[in-house]
Amino acid sequence: MDILPFADMGATAWDAFCDESREAWLRHTTTFMTFGETMGEENHNLSFSLMEGGTIRAVVPIMVQTQGGVRVCSVGGHPTPYPALAEDLTPHERVTALDLIFGEIDRRAREHHSTSIRMFVDPLTEPVVQNEVLVNPLLERGYRDTSIHTSCVDLTQIEETLLQKMASRRRRYIIAAERTGTYSVEVFDAHTITKEVFDAYVELYSNAAGRVVWSEPHTQGTLNLIRAGAGLLVLLRASGESGYRAGHMVMLYKQRAYDLSSAIVPAYRHDHDIGAVMQWESMRYLKHSGYSHYEIGWLLPQTEEYSHKERSISHFKSLFGGEVLPLFRGEKYYNIEESLIV
């Protein structure tokens, strides 16, 4: 098998492989690569494929960026997805391919002065959803284990079951809001999104954070993600009001979805029914649009390693009846002294 840089391969063949691969999800695609380039500085796309007789045998997305003045292999702080290999490789061929892949990852990372790489096995890939990945494959590649879990809702269940599996308080919030018609939720996709609507979410997001969070390139990149059919924007307002109180972004691929970001206007942050209603209406929309799984959020350990805000968000996302799936992660350092500064 031979290594072919992404620049010599092109997007069409790469994405066609991802579309067919059980081991690829959106984060493997060129759509997400383009999006990722808006989330860092001094971006270099180091992605490559393995080729054999003119056939793609694996795709390896990898990007090096400057974050906080430090060079890292990352996508805007998101870990790099584990390589996606062709399904028909024999066990021996898989080992050979992975040996070649991880050697090349290390070479490229060092060549571009990356201090570290963080990688994960995407929970929305078919092998994880089907419970075929039982151990962290990164450990045998010299990565330090940083695995956690994630919550993934099975949308093939009927609505009554989805509601019943939620924490009782969230369920009561949703039922009460539906009965009184308290809120109106709108969902915007590639066909209905407009710049004006998206700008309203960006303003809402900045108000929630208390500062401008997104750069202009990232704002445009996020809008482009929706326009490419890889995202949804969900916005909530009180019935009879014109302004939005909350919203969130969902990433889409292969009839599976991931909750990317959320924001609530600070004045309504303690209205606990808002988040519950917004998630429920998102789940209903996805279910009726034929989506099978919705990864609602990573479940972080309740330790001081994470901020109070991060732990609170993680706890909130655990309340919606999702199946707990492994989130196999790992990190590897190429320059320990610089990495410790991060």
Give the positions of each predicted feature.
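A conserved beta-strand-loop-helix scaffold within acyl/acetyltransferase catalytic domains
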Residues: 3-53, 57-69, 123-148, 153-268
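A gly/proline- and charged-residue-enriched helix-loop-helix capping module
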Residues: 76-128
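Short, solvent-exposed turn/loop segments enriched in Gly/Ser/Thr/Pro and often Arg
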Residues: 63, 120-125, 329-335
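C-terminal "cap" of GNAT-fold acetyltransferases
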Residues: 153-157, 333-342
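Aromatic (often tryptophan-rich) hydrophobic motifs at membrane interfaces
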Residues: 49, 99-103, 224, 230-338
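Conserved acetyl-CoA binding element of GNAT-fold acetyltransferases
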Residues: 70-89, 255-267, 297
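Soluble or luminal CAZymes and related metallo-dependent hydrolases
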Residues: 93-101, 169, 214-218, 274, ...
